[in-house]
Design a protein with these regions (language model features):
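Glycine/proline-rich low-complexity spacer/linker segments in large multi-domain proteins
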Residues: 51, 82-114, 601-609, 730-772
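A low-complexity, Ser/Thr/Gly/Pro-enriched, surface-exposed linker/loop concept
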Residues: 4, 29-68
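Short, well-ordered beta-strand segments enriched in hydrophobic/aromatic residues
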Residues: 26, 34-36, 73-80, 537-540, ...
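Solvent-exposed beta-strand/loop surfaces of large extracellular or lumenal domains
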Residues: 47-61, 564-584, 688-713
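Catalytic and substrate-binding clefts that recognize carbohydrates or anionic sugar/phosphate headgroups
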Residues: 63-199, 206-207, 212, 219-224, ...
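Catalytic core of carbohydrate-active enzymes
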Residues: 369, 389-396, 410-414, 418-428, ...
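A conserved hydrophobic secondary-structure block that centers on an alpha-helix together
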Residues: 125, 195, 199, 205-242, ...
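Aromatic- and carboxylate-enriched substrate-binding clefts and catalytic-loop regions
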Residues: 103, 107-109, 228-481, 516-518, ...
Length: 796
């Protein structure tokens, strides 16, 4: 049990990369990454640890100069000075040179530098911000991970306490080359595995005493309203709670289905599977297995030393391999055989066990993940963050946040900054979990954030007033929620490819802006803005709409380039900061010129778990671009053997030529034929011709003037065919400023004559700057000048 078939461990560093004395050992991993050890007994550790699994990197060129009891070590990216003896800030330092950091960076042992932050164990009871643990990225150019106190893994994959004391740290000296640092962190600690496809759809979760009938009715209502969900999460009321005899303690921990609510659990879960939903079930395991549990006799028999006559409880001893193997075999596996797909490990009881330094949360995450993969399926866990290396066990559960605007405002930054410690698949309680207050716009903006987050899981408490069903909100709010939940599933082809990219290229779905633009000071100040895969820059709305304007204000930085709004089709010039104003129907999602985004309309039920027959490809004009669509079986670990299908797409903007190349690879994994619609966004209307390899492809074209979208529909075509679409005269559209401003003013709750006066200013034959000056002089309602100015100056 607990075999690791997902990662390769090579924990022993190369001898030729090692500098060793009686009490010290330095191991070069890359020209920028070095392991530093010091032990008085001279016994150094070569086994994998809870954090570090691989130390066998490529050979590194270096030179060394002996200096008394120490030495100076040089690579082309760093200079280490060690005076000998125990590590102190006076005896050990490192100077990072080269790379993207023009002035170098000095690190002294024990100093933390200007760390950019990592993530936190949980957002439980957080209202707004919380303190983050450190990540690997630092504006000072150097950072460290301290592995001195983590446990090691023996040859059987079980944890062992290190013997003796010592220092075991890894220093990252990458300057501001954050992408390279993150890549080597994953090489050191293990890759982020791919998620199964269903995990990227919408999750429904609520702490609520559902019954089989009420849950089926809920799912049926979702289907009727055409609201797609791919995961159903059952909180703790699936098991006996209030029914537990007080002599056994509370019902917080439980493993026995409440037959009053779910008379036939297997029937219920089969029904959910038939309706395209996977099932995750909540566990609070700390209370152990008590005599009232159905699994108690089998567990007691397996362990063999339980006083069942006196109903002795079986303590939850995560430090015992015998207990843990029995726990999975006797308690969890029978429920998985009934239909549970993965477990929600809701551990809230701290980090203390019988073994010093052993965090039970890490143990739960590690062994749950390995066990979930035992039959060759792609595993999944759902649990809190347990320190560096936790990215190996997706998905992260961030805990019970408070329902406030302050909590929403913190989550974009919290999510993107977690990439600084490689933790790339956070799942938040979208809409907030508890307390707080009712605010319909807040609920909507949270859903919009969720759709452009790693995982989109709606969740709330038992409070009868806190339901997240879209029909619980006013129609204008609920309908937009539905649109966004559908959009999440429409984006699954793009998201699944980004899922593969995270695994293959060590690049998380969400990155802070300073990863791509490390030399830009402003990239460090737009904390709620992030890159969302290869195509988008996202700046979620986290403030209430400006009264009177009817739109919410969000501060956005656009790097150099051209951008096209995902929702409105407006074209923007980059290399500037600006305030953007969005009504309830959208948030700032800016596609980069040349971006290619595969989407689908096959989004309901079991459609979400398979590769679609009908594809919509969004192509954003203004620059060349390329995309490689990744597809596989969506649920096994065959991706580790590169069993997949790749479909290349590319745009040559100057000639208007867009090509969908032949699909290549395991073609039996995708439909034999596909129907394509290619949408060119941000373009003027023009002719479009279609060529299909040996198929005589015919196509239809239509143009949406309001969105600047030219759609070319190609009928059913073999997946092995090449499709070439050529635009007659490719050119970016000119924004229809007058119509956009009219639509803004038409909905604004301001005096009618003020609206007329603003439109008159727009009609004047004067510069945009002069128009804004005259508009400001009118002293209109707050936000009107900014909202009009955004449209007026979108293209500079």
């Amino acid at each position: 049990m607990f075999e690791n078939n997902l990662w390769t461990m090579e924990p022993i560093g190369r001898p030729e990369n090692t500098i060793q004395g009686d009490k010290y050992r330095f191991t070069l991993l890359t020209p920028c990454l070095i392991r530093m050890e010091y032990r008085e007994d001279g016994k150094f550790e070569d086994r994998p640890t809870q954090i570090v699994w691989n130390r066998k990197f490529d050979p590194v060129e270096f030179r060394i100069e002996k200096k008394g009891e120490g030495f100076e070590l040089f690579t082309d990216r760093m200079h280490v000075t060690y005076a000998g003896g125990p590590f102190t800030k006076n005896s050990l330092n490192l100077n990072a040179v080269g790379g993207q950091n023009a002035y170098g960076a000095v690190w002294y042992y024990g100093e933390k530098g200007d760390n950019l932050g990592g993530t936190a164990r949980t957002l439980d009871e957080v209202d707004g911000e919380c303190q983050l643990q450190e990540g690997m990225m630092s504006r000072s150019g150097c950072s460290q991970i301290d592995d001195s106190h983590s446990l090691v893994l023996d040859e059987n994959g079980w944890t062992q306490v290190r013997t003796g004391d010592g220092v075991d740290i890894y220093v990252f000296a990458y300057g501001n080359d954050y992408k390279e640092a993150l890549n080597d962190f994953y090489r050191l600690t293990g890759k982020t595995p791919m998620l199964p496809r269903y995990a990227l759809g919408n999750w429904w979760s609520r702490y609520y005493a559902y019954t089989e009938d009420s849950y089926k009715a809920l799912v049926t209502r979702f289907e009727k309203e055409k609201i797609p969900f791919s995961v159903g999460v059952l909180d703790m009321d699936w098991h006996l709670v209030e029914e537990v005899n007080p002599k056994y303690g509370s019902g917080w921990t439980g493993y026995t289905w409440n037959k009053k609510y779910y008379p036939d659990p297997e029937r219920f879960m089969n029904w959910l599977h038939d309706h395209g939903m996977k099932i995750s079930v909540n566990l609070h395991p700390a209370g152990g297995i008590r005599a009232f549990e159905e699994a108690y006799p089998a567990m007691a028999k397996e362990l063999g030393d339980v006083d069942t006559e006196h109903e002795a409880p079986i303590d939850f001893d995560i430090t015992s391999r015998k207990f843990l193997e029995a726990y999975f075999k006797c308690v969890l596996h029978p429920e998985e055989n009934k239909g549970v797909d993965f477990w929600w490990i809701d551990w809230q009881q701290g980090n203390i066990t019988k073994v010093p330094g052993l965090d039970p949360l890490w143990m739960l995450n590690h062994y749950h993940y390995l066990d979930n993969a035992r039959d060759g399926k792609r595993p999944l866990t759902f649990s809190r963050y347990a320190g560096p290396g936790s990215h190996r066990y997706p998905v992260g559960f961030s805990g019970d946040s408070i329902v406030t605007w302050e909590s929403l405002n913190f989550q974009p930054y919290f999510t993107s900054t977690a990439s600084n410690i490689g933790y790339d698949w956070w799942s938040h309680d979208i809409g907030g979990h508890m307390l707080g207050y009712r605010d319909n716009e807040l609920a909507l903006r949270w859903v919009q954030l969720g759709v452009f987050s790693p995982i989109n899981r709606l969740h709330s408490s038992k409070n009868e007033f806190m339901g997240k069903e879209p029909w619980q909100f006013p129609m204008e709010i609920g309908e937009v929620m539905k649109e966004f939940l559908r959009l999440r599933h429409q984006m699954l082809p793009y998201l699944y490819t980004m899922n593969y990219r995270a695994y293959k290229e060590n690049t998380p779905l969400i990155l802070p802006m300073y990863y791509t633009y490390p030399a830009e000071q402003v990239a460090y100040t737009v904390k709620n803005e992030y890159e969302y895969g290869t195509a988008f820059i996202v700046a979620p709305v986290t403030e209430k709409s400006v009264q009177g304007v009817g739109r919410a204000r969000t501060h956005v930085w656009l790097p150099e380039g051209t951008y096209i709004d995902f929702f409105t089709g407006l074209v923007y010039s980059g290399d500037r900061e600006m305030d953007m104003y969005r009504d309830l129907h959208s948030i700032p999602v800016l596609a980069k010129a040349g971006a290619i985004v595969p989407m689908t309309e096959e989004i309901f039920g079991q459609e979400a778990a398979r590769n679609p027959e009908t594809m919509t490809i969004r192509v954003y004009g203004g620059a060349d671009g390329s995309f490689q669509l990744y597809e596989d079986d969506n649920e096994s670990n065959a991706y580790l053997k590169d069993e997949c299908v790749l479909t290349d797409m590319d745009l040559k903007w100057s000639t208007g030529r867009f090509v969908i190349h032949k699909a290549a690879g395991r073609l039996e994994l995708i439909p034999q034929k596909r129907t394509w619609t290619v949408e060119f966004w941000g373009v003027k209307d023009t002719e479009a011709t279609v060529e299909g390899e040996g198929t005589g492809v015919e196509a239809s074209k239509k143009y949406d003037e309001a969105l600047g979208c030219l759609a070319v529909s190609v009928p059913e075509t073999a997946a092995t065919s090449e499709i070439i679409i050529t635009l007659g005269a490719p050119e970016l559209r000119e924004n229809d400023v007058k119509t956009q401003v009219f639509n803004l003013l038409n909905q604004a709750e301001i005096p009618y004559m003020e609206k007329v006066a603003i439109m008159e200013i727009l009609d004047k034959k004067i510069s945009n700057a002069a128009k804004l000056t005259q508009l400001t002089a009118m002293h209109p309602e707050e936000g009107i000048v900014g909202a009009v100015g955004e449209i007026l100056t979108a293209i500079e």
